[in-house]
Amino acid sequence: MIQQNINTIVGSLPQHVRLVAVSKYHPIEKIREAYAAGQRLFGESRANELREKAMLMPSDTEWHFIGHLQKNKVKTVVPIVSMIHSIDSLALMMEIERQTAKFVDERVVRGLSPRIKVLLQLHVAKEETKFGFTIGELRGMLDGGLWREFKHVEMAGLMCMATHTDDREEIRREFQFAKTCFDEIRQEYFSVDGNFRECSWGMTDDYPIALDCGSTMVRVGSGIFGQREY
């Protein structure tokens, strides 16, 4: 079933869009089944769970951290992941810069770049519980310019999560707003930086809409693995 799900989803994605298999809360056996089906990129949202699973998977498995990241967990995450999707403050980015500098050798041994890629999380949903910058906050942070001094953090694009709703047009409006913000931010701050190119939005229930709105990376969990096991 997992192999069939992956084949169906991958077959529906444009060639330039990557599938992040959201493996959080799922047992290692299911992750291995997805790996056997050809999936190599997995997303986790808990630092300790990520570390435990990474130790049990082949070395060519790629890991992204996709959940809210507390600063005290950064040192656990940065030796393992190629990308962090959930940057919601300058302070978090500064801690990632500091910790990644300490783990450069370990990252290289794992086949990772000395620089860790990050996505800036944009708050587009109606729920106040979701994290992320408003577009005003994001511009303020970028205008400050401190991020330009980072040597171990590479800004790779934006991430967002839509409102949890059955209103498909609301979801489309939110994703389209995120794409507009991405285009403006890239033009204003990253016009000479070809690395700022990722749009991470779309999950199991809404990724087809996300694809219409410029997504380059979809995060699918239950659509691959079934319901979570807590």
Functional labels for PLM-detected ranges:
Residues T216-M217:
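Divalent-metal-activated hydrolytic enzyme cores
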Residues V220-Y230:
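Short C-terminal tail/terminal secondary-structure segment
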